[in-house]
Amino acid sequence: MSESEARAAQRAVEVLSAYGVSHVFGVPGAKIDSIYDALVDSGPQLVVCRHEQNAVFMAAAVGRLTGTPGAVVVTSGPGTSNTATGLLTANTEQDPVVALCGAVPRADRLKRSHQSMDATAALKAFTKYTGEVNDAGNVPEAVANALRAALTQPRGAAAVILPSDVLATPVSAGITRACPVPRLGPAPAEGIEQAARLIRDARRPVILAGVRGADPEACAALRTLLEDTDLPVVETFQAAGVVSRTLDEHYLGRVGLFRNQPGDIVISHADVLVTVGFDAVEYDPKLWNTDPSRTVVHIDVVPANIDNHYQPAIELQGDVASTVRALAGQLSGLRLDPEVLGELAEQRRALKDADDTARTANHTRAGLNPVSVLLTLRDMIDDDATVTCDVGSHYIYTARHFRAYEPRHLLFSDGQQTLGVALPWAMAACLVRPGKQVVSVSGDGGFLFSAQELETATRLGLHFTHVILRDNTYDMVRFQEELKYGRTSGVQLGDYDIAQYAGAFGAHGYRVETEEQFAKVLGEALSREARVQPGITIIDVPVDYTRNTELFAQLHEGVLE
C-alpha cells in the first residue's frame, strides 16, 4: 500500500468526519472490524453498545438532537438484521442516521455461507437509501451519499452494505470535505400572499405545528410570527416545545392518537388551518379533519401527502423558516376578534383544569397517580432539560400534560411507537448535551427492551435519571383491549426488583411508595453538580392506571363541530 493509499475502511471514517459525525455507535464483528480499527486513530467517538437496535436508537437521537446524522457500525448477518427496528423508527420519525453494515466477502455473497444474507433487500424496506458497495473506490462516495440522503427532507435512515474484502482494499480516492444538501428558498411569493389573505380574512385561523416545524430555524421563524399576531398554536407530539414560555398565551395544547383534547376543539373550529411542517404520520388526518373542504394552508419543505381527509387549498413548498418569515411580514399586527380570543382563553383554562383534575384524581393503594408523578417531574426540571419518553400509557399522559418550552427537548416515538427508545435516547442526550439535565421515562415493560444499555451508560460515566412507572402490565394495550372486547389478553407481566437490577450495573436504584419519596429521590438525582447522587439513578414508581380508559374518551360532535 503506497503512502497515498488507505484502506477503504479508513476512507469511510474520513467521510464521517468530513460530514461532522460526532459519534459512532455499534457492536463489533469480524466483517466490520476494519472500520473499528480505523476509529482507533481518528474519526468520531466510538460507543460500543450491548445491542445493535439500541445503537441505532442512540444514533438516531443524536441526529434528532443535533441535526447531524448519527452513525452506526455493525457486522454482517444478525448484526445487520438487528438494526431493522431502529432504522424503521428513525426513518418514520425523520431522524437522520446512517448505518454502515459489514458483509461477507464478495466471493461468498451468493453462497450459503456463515452470515451471508441479502442485506440490501432486507434494509430497503426500512430506509430511504440502501446500497451495497462492490468496488473499494466507491466506498467514500457511497457513504457520502448515504449521509446526504439521511439529511434530505424528509430526513431519515440510510444504510451502506460493505463487504469485508472491499473494506480491506487500499484505495487512493477519498472525500475529505462535506457537500451540504442544498437549502431551498421560500415558497413562491404569490402563494405566500394568497395564504396571507386567507389567514387575514379568517375568523378562527389556527396553526398546527408539526415535526419539521420544530427544526430550530423553523421554530425561531414561527415564534417571530407569534410575537406580532394573535394566532393560536396546537402542537403535535413531535413539535413539543415549539411554543416558548414567553409565548405561552398562544399555546393550545398537543394533539395525537385520540381526538379528545382542547387542541382538537380548537382545530375543529378553525376556518383556516395552517399546518407548519406537519407530517400525516404524526396524527392521521382522518381522525381530526372530518371536513376535508375546510381551508388548509400547507407550509412545508416537502409536498403534502394528499388523502381523503387532507387536501390543502394552498401548498407553500419551500424552506419552512424562510416561508414562515415571509408570511410573518404580511401578517404583522394580526388581531383576532375578542369573542374568538375569549373562546381560546376558555380552551386554555380547559388545559389547566385537565392538569389539575388529573393531578388530584383519586388513586388506590396499588400505586401513585401517574399524572401527579409526571407533573412533579416537570416542576423540578429546568426548561433546558431533555426528557425522553418511551411508549405506554405514560406516553399519552406525558404528551397531554408535560409542558416543554424548547423544541427537541421532549422526545416521543410518534411514528412507530417503538418500545425501548427512552433509555438509549437519554444516553445520546447526555453525550451531545453535556452538563444539562436528562431524564428518561418508561414503563416497566418498555424498560427491559433496552435496559442492558445501563452497562454502556455506566461505562461511559453518564449522568441521567430514568423513571419507571410500573404497573406490571402492557397497560396501553390493556386498556384498549378492555374497551374493544370487555376483557384482556396477553398483557400481564411479572414484577422484578428494579433497584437490584440497577445496582448490578453500577447504577443507583430506588423503589418509592409516596410522592414525597419520589420528589426527594428525584431532587437528589437531578443535582446539577451530581454531588448528591452521581451517575445514573433509576426510580421505580408504582402507579395506578385504573382510570386509563378515560384516555380514549371521545368528544361528542356538538363540542367538536
Task: Specify the residue positions occupied by each region the protein language model found.
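Phosphate/pyrophosphate-binding active-site segments
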Residues: S2-E3, I175, P292-S293, V297-Y395, ...
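N-terminal alpha/beta PP-like core and its mobile active-site loop of ThDP/TPP-dependent enzymes
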Residues: S2-R335, T376, M380-D383, H463-H466, ...
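Active-site diphosphate/adenylate-binding microenvironment
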Residues: A9-A12, Y19, A30, I35-V40, ...
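Thiamine diphosphate
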Residues: D108-Q115, R245, F258, D307-H309, ...
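Short hydrophobic beta-strand that contains or immediately precedes a catalytic carboxylate
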Residues: L208, T388, S442
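Active-site-proximal structural scaffolding
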Residues: L226, V266-I267, P370, S450, ...
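Hydrophobic, well-ordered secondary-structure segments
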Residues: E282-P285, S293, L327-L336, V340-D355, ...
